[in-house]
Amino acid sequence: MAASVANCCFSVLNASVKIQSSSISSPWCFVSASSLTPRASSNIKRKSSRSDSPSPILNPEKNYPGRVRDESSNPPQKMAFKAFGSPKKEKKESLSDFSRDQQTDPAKIHDASFLNAVVKVYCTHTAPDYSLPWQKQRQFTSTGSAFMIGDGKLLTNAHCVEHDTQVKVKRRGDDRKYVAKVLVRGVDCDIALLSVESEDFWKGAEPLRLGHLPRLQDSVTVVGYPLGGDTISVTKGVVSRIEVTSYAHGSSDLLGIQIDAAINPGNSGGPAFNDQGECIGVAFQVYRSEETENIGYVIPTTVVSHFLTDYERNGKYTGYPCLGVLLQKLENPALRECLKVPTNEGVLVRRVEPTSDASKVLKEGDVIVSFDDLHVGCEGTVPFRSSERIAFRYLISQKFAGDIAEIGIIRAGEHKKVQVVLRPRVHLVPYHIDGGQPSYIIVAGLVFTPLSEPLIEEECEDTIGLKLLTKARYSVARFRGEQIVILSQVLANEVNIGYEDMNNQQVLKFNGIPIRNIHHLAHLIDMCKDKYLVFEFEDNYVAVLEREASNSASLCILKDYGIPSERSADLLEPYVDPIDDTQALDQGIGDSPVSNLEIGFDGLVWA
């Protein structure tokens, strides 16, 4: 899949690439607006040691956004995510208060004192090594931006400070760097909150206030430190579109603002302004293809305010909730007549996630016709402002985890209303492991770990195999805490002769017991008193180890391969059974694959 790649090498999350149609001849992808040095880009993605055919180094689908390895021998080009500042208040204010309206002189956008609020973020990243989960990858550095929102806080993109080990910030016109701390990351909305303790950093700074959602064709100004120079850059354009948009970093779908102002590598994290000098959002990604140009995306202030309110309410970020249903449009008259839907409205429930609260009140075949008394059209849209419509999922995104929604449905021709508690989606294969190391356990050289999107990306899709990829893309969790556990690799030793070539295979059972997650597997192994350890894999493959011989070989294997522990720290904790429904295991993983928006099927969509 081709994508426009500059010398700085745009970086793209694998989950951000969307296939628009069955034809691969019209490629397009979302990329984060961050810059990379030419030399750093060649090293940013280390190949798997077991990969027979290394992937192209500059393939944007195999790189993480916003990361630049520091090369002292070849000074990196500046990579910018911009930031605005606000003074540290003596009187503590609510973070959500900064969404209040504040009229600003339009000329102030070009005033030096206003631009001084923009700061540059310097981040050192140390990402986990998902192929060798007991260690981390070599550290690298990146630069970005953030803007001050008051009370000693900075706002930036989550991908700017992902897997951070050190964060520093520097104001415009200042040669000093100040240590910053990441307070919270919202991966799904690509927003992070930083704090700076130094009083000197905040001298002369003014807080930035958030404005309203703009209108179509409103002027917009994007400020930042993009590639091409060290000083601040200002670009202008107009609002082209406002709709539910795919967020590349979080693999989520939230409200987004499309603009035609140039957003280049380095603009991530920088504010976008209207003509009144109000911040209407945060620049975070661009849309690249051979047929388009100047399509940038801004996180609107409604999403920013939701993030801040969530953090303020809970003391942590709980994430955006979902309804947990797969929906189909009802545009066909015969389909509506068959379902006894009298009017041109509603969307059909095709599947309900077992882990969602909707599974208690909604059924396949129900037609959702309203959400909190707002009518849902047959195309899955609801009224939005004057003379506009927007995807039904927008209403769900306005809720918080734990909120209750009233759903109007038609079931077998009968109108009903049900209440559903909205909770964050449970991913069978997580898109991110934010903080900490991946879980793993090593048994006689057999390395077991949960399947995750970062692992798939690191291993390359070709080495993962079609079956695992299908489950990762299409399957849903049957219960909270469920994982797909795989045998990642085998560390060769005489105790595991004959199994050395096994890798990336799903383990289904241990001594006849179905595996629920990696912690469950570790628990079963610890409790085992049988003579043999029997692992059953996909495709009916089996591996048998003698228990006492395996235990005796463990220390030798760890020493030979320089591994500090046979398991990750989280697996040392007592095991808690995640299943609250004993019938959940009767349903096979992946037996009923479903589609999702990223695959490009326009008729079915998760909400």
From Swiss-Prot:
The active site is at 159 (charge relay system), 190 (charge relay system), 268 (charge relay system). It is an enzyme of class 3 (hydrolase). GO terms for molecular function: serine-type endopeptidase activity. It is a peripheral membrane protein. Its EC number is 3.4.21.-. Residues 118-317 are annotated as: Serine protease. This is Protease Do-like 2, chloroplastic. It comes from Arabidopsis thaliana (Mouse-ear cress). The gene is DEGP2.
